[in-house]
């Protein structure tokens, strides 16, 4: 009976402990909150400056300063270790009354959340504007302006692309309507500056000669051109043949003369200038020979002038060289006279030679 009562008391106590014990995560949060609150509430600790930069010579000479430094370190660490142990024990201790610890844990969580939020804002660069400097604010303003400018540019590009697509669609529909207009405009009554180019091969020499003979009218070559001497000789030869034919057969000579006149008229009708007047040909030949003689005289005069100029420049050059040579010799003589030499030229001038 006593064993059953003991077992029942043991199970009831165990159930109370399990029910009263909080979960693992709140315990950790409570301990962290308590430690942080205690640290925040506690006065700032005075950190002792440790003598870390000691010279190597003193360490080599004596070991006593080392022992003292190690003793000081151990003494300085003892209160810290004791405080840590106290914090750990206080965190591990479960309060008998769980409702009394809840306000402290909630306050610690709020403090932690506030600190975390502040750190996140500082990392993002979105802290309060009062704490930021003017350079940071200017930098933010420039970044914002750059973002706005890029947005506007992207918006303009999208608008241009839409307009181009709309224009292409309109052009695709317009050609069907423009084709009849172009066909109607392509039927004028007269066309100017229309040049038809054929891909014919150039004619050879025999073909050109044949075409030239076909162009002749009455097998009579027209008296055209500016070779007045040749035209005059041809005209005189034609007149001599007519005189010879007139002596033999007057009728045939008249027929040939009429044929020649008619052929000349046909050539003149086509716009060819016929030079069949012997007097005019002789005058033209005289004028041409006169102009040729004038050009010949002008050319000869020009060549003579050029040759004279060249000779004049050559003579001037030679004269300048002689003067330069004489001046050089005179300078040498002057130098010799300054040195006290007696020259034969001076003796001749003095009449002592």
Swiss-Prot record:
Disulfide bonds: none annotated. PANTHER family: SURFEIT LOCUS PROTEIN 6. The gene is SURF6. GO terms for biological process: ribosomal large subunit biogenesis; ribosomal small subunit biogenesis. It comes from Bos taurus (Bovine). Its main location: nucleus. A motif (Nuclear localization signal) lies at residues 45-49, 149-153. GO terms for cellular component: chromosome; nucleolus; nucleoplasm. GO terms for molecular function: DNA binding; molecular condensate scaffold activity; RNA binding. Residues 19-100, 121-218, 292-353 are annotated as: Disordered. This is Surfeit locus protein 6. Residues 44-53, 139-157, 206-216 have a biased composition (Basic residues). Binds to both DNA and RNA in vitro, with a stronger binding capacity for RNA. May represent a nucleolar constitutive protein involved in ribosomal biosynthesis or assembly. Belongs to the SURF6 family. Keywords: DNA-binding, Nucleus, Phosphoprotein, RNA-binding. The modification Phosphothreonine is found at residue 221. The modification Phosphoserine is found at residue 133. The keyword Cell inner membrane does not apply. Residues 72-86 have a biased composition (Basic and acidic residues). It is found in: Nucleus, Nucleoplasm; Nucleus, Nucleolus. It holds the Pfam family SURF6.
């Amino acid at each position: 009976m006593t064993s059953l009562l003991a077992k029942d008391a043991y199970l009831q106590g165990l159930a109370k402990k399990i029910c009263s014990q909080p979960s693992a995560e709140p315990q950790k949060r409570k301990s962290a909150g308590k430690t942080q609150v205690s640290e925040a509430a506690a006065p700032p600790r005075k950190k002792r400056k440790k003598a870390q930069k000691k010279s190597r010579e003193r360490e080599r000479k004596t070991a006593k300063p080392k022992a003292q430094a190690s003793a000081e370190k151990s003494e300085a660490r003892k209160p810290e270790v004791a405080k840590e142990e106290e914090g750990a024990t206080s965190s591990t201790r479960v309060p008998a009354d769980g409702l009394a610890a809840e306000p402290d844990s909630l306050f610690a969580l709020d403090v932690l959340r506030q600190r975390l939020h502040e750190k996140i804002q500082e990392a993002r660069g979105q802290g309060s504007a009062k704490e930021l400097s003017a350079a940071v604010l200017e930098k933010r303003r420039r970044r914002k302006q750059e973002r706005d400018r890029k947005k506007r540019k992207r918006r303009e590009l999208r608008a241009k692309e839409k307009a181009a697509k709309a224009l292409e669609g309109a052009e695709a529909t317009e050609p069907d309507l423009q084709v009849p207009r172009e066909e109607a405009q392509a039927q004028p009554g007269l066309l100017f500056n229309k040049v038809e180019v054929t891909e014919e091969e150039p004619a050879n020499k025999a073909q050109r000669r044949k075409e030239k003979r076909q162009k002749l009218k009455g097998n009579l070559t027209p008296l055209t051109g500016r070779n007045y001497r040749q035209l005059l000789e041809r005209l005189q030869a034609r007149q001599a043949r007519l005189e010879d034919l007139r002596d033999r057969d007057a009728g045939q000579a008249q027929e040939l003369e009429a044929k020649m006149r008619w052929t000349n008229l046909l050539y003149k009708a086509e716009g060819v200038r016929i030079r069949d007047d012997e007097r005019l040909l002789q005058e033209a030949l005289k004028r041409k020979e006169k102009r040729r003689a004038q050009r010949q005289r002008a050319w000869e005069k020009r060549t003579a002038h050029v040759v004279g100029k060249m000779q004049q420049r050559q003579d001037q050059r030679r004269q300048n060289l002689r003067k330069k040579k004489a001046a050089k010799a005179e300078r040498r003589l002057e130098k010799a006279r300054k040195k006290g030499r007696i020259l034969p030229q001076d003796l001749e001038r003095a009449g002592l030679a």
